[in-house]
């Protein structure tokens, strides 16, 4: 079974990468084109209006759907435009129904005990936020069968896409998803019986608040190609058991802002082609992992985009296989403690292009670094202390700093999000065997750029399983690939990472500053928590 899943994972990645460079289609003035390759027209759409008392169809159309009170079931192919406000309603696409376009055109839909939108097994559905429209979907605490086992209607997500469903979320309007039950958006698996499953997000302005579990959770292929996403989650911001693709070659999108989460982006195979990504997490910002660490080739590949990652008590980028950075701009800050590593991989870390600044407490247990593009390393390269212990600092939190070449030219400048005892820097401007000086306040630290295989310590540092899996391989009860409500995986020494505001993170405000605001640059001490 694990071998089959590995093959499916590889096939899904190949298909998604093949589509990565697709060009936008010509604009057709007779249709609305929210994104490349996605067209819809309201001319022949069935218009359905929700109210608290029921659903009405414009012009008396009565084909392709069924109405039961405030529950709408779509039974046939076509375009359905939904609007209105309802305090307890739902939309369901019947199993096996394909060719469905669901246009949200000013819809505010809440459901009391199930998912506001459910795409059943083997469906093909495009959910479009109409141009300029503002839409919202909200569930209740009862939409969680872990907490309410007697609720047979619970779907554990605001938008539930079941096994074998192929769903695209797109449009030039906005959609706010509030998950009071469990997940924001949940996509199912590819199975022999139900067919291939996938979830794609394009162009949409998507806001997800998930105070219980994940914002987006997929069991198969998840493509976030473009759009603007703002996410706050108790657990993962965006998770896929298998393949997660962010962006597309030759494009600028998407823009992803994660204001709070446990882990940021997580998948067995995580690929970032483009985008502007800003993640604030309490554990790993990027994680190549899933709930089962056997039978997969875990990879993290970054070829473009701008990524700013800040972890208060975890690693920056953590791969249970190889980690490759070949382009883009990557800035990572992790808390200045001995067990927080900005870059961590079981396999080889390869830097062959782009601009990389990775700063944190230390290089942990060390890393196997292939510097195809030269890099300069400052500070701790080993254990450096007991897990959780604070390190002396090269830079203090909030300090302005520069990295200069031998002629005094700045090759990088910035402001520290937290104190850091370990800094790795690489860019196209760095020349092997040349000297570079890190300057912060009145202090300076010398370094020499290296290339080829670079050893930073005592060997590779292993990551932990994704999705809440404990190191001993035992999943928690009611396991669905993610952590149960509020739990955190144990570290080998039994220490559990601290999380802000109790068990669930909340959007930070001034996170990471000491009582007096900041430590002075170069004074040898530092805040241990990155600033927001």
Model-derived features: positions:
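A composition-driven surface/loop motif
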Residues: 5-14, 20-532
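N-terminal hydrophobic targeting signals that begin at the initiator methionine
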Residues: 1-2
């Amino acid at each position: 079974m694990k071998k089959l899943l590995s093959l499916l994972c590889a096939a899904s990645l190949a298909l998604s990468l093949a589509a990565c460079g697709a060009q936008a289609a010509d604009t057709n003035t007779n249709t609305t084109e929210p994104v490349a390759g996605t067209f819809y027209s309201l001319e022949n759409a069935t218009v359905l209006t929700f109210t608290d008392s029921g659903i009405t169809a414009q012009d008396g159309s009565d084909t392709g759907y069924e109405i039961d009170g405030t529950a709408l079931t779509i039974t046939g192919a076509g375009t359905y435009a939904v609007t209105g406000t309802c305090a307890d309603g739902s939309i369901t696409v019947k199993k096996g129904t394909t060719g469905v376009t669901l246009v949200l055109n000013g819809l505010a839909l809440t459901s009391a005990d199930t998912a506001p939108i459910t795409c059943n097994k083997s469906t093909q559905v495009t959910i479009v936020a109409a141009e300029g429209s503002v839409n919202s979907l909200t569930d209740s605490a009862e939409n969680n069968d872990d907490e309410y086992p007697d609720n047979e209607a619970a779907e554990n997500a605001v938008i539930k896409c079941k096994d074998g469903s192929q769903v695209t979320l797109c449009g030039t309007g906005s959609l706010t998803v509030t998950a009071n039950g469990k997940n924001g958006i949940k996509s199912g698996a590819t199975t022999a019986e139900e067919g291939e499953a996938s979830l794609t997000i394009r162009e949409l302005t998507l806001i997800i608040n998930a105070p219980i579990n994940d914002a987006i959770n997929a069991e198969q292929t998840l493509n976030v190609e473009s759009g603007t996403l703002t996410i706050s989650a108790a657990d993962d911001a965006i998770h896929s058991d298998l393949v997660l693709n962010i962006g597309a070659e030759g494009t600028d999108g998407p823009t992803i802002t994660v204001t709070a989460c446990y882990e940021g982006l997580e998948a067995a195979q995580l690929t970032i082609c483009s985008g502007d990504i800003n993640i604030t997490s309490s554990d790993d910002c990027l994680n190549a992992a899933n709930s089962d660490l056997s039978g997969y080739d875990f990879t993290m590949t970054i070829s473009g985009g701008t990524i700013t990652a800040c972890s208060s008590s975890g690693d920056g980028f953590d791969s249970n296989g190889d980690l490759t950075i070949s382009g883009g701009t990557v800035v990572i800050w992790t808390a200045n403690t001995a067990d927080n590593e900005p870059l961590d991989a079981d396999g080889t870390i390869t830097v062959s292009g782009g601009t990389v600044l990775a700063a944190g407490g230390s290089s942990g247990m060390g890393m196997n670094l292939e510097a195809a593009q030269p890099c300069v390393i400052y500070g701790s390269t080993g254990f450096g202390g007991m897990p959780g212990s604070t390190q002396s600092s090269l830079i203090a939190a909030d300090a302005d700093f520069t990295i200069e070449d031998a002629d005094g030219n700045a090759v990088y400048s910035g402001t520290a999000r937290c104190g850091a005892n370990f800094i790795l820097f690489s860019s196209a401007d760095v020349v092997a065997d040349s000297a570079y000086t890190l300057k912060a306040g009145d202090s300076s630290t010398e370094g020499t750029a290296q290339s080829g295989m670079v050893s930073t310590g005592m060997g590779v540092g292993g990551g932990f399983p994704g999705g809440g899996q404990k190191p001993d391989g035992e999943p928690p009860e009611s396991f669905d690939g993610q952590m149960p409500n509020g739990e955190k995986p144990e570290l080998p020494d039994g220490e559990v990472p601290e999380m802000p505001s109790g068990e669930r993170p909340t959007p930070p405000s001034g996170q990471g500053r000491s009582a007096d605001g900041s430590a002075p640059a170069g004074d040898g001490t530092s805040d241990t928590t990155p600033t927001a």
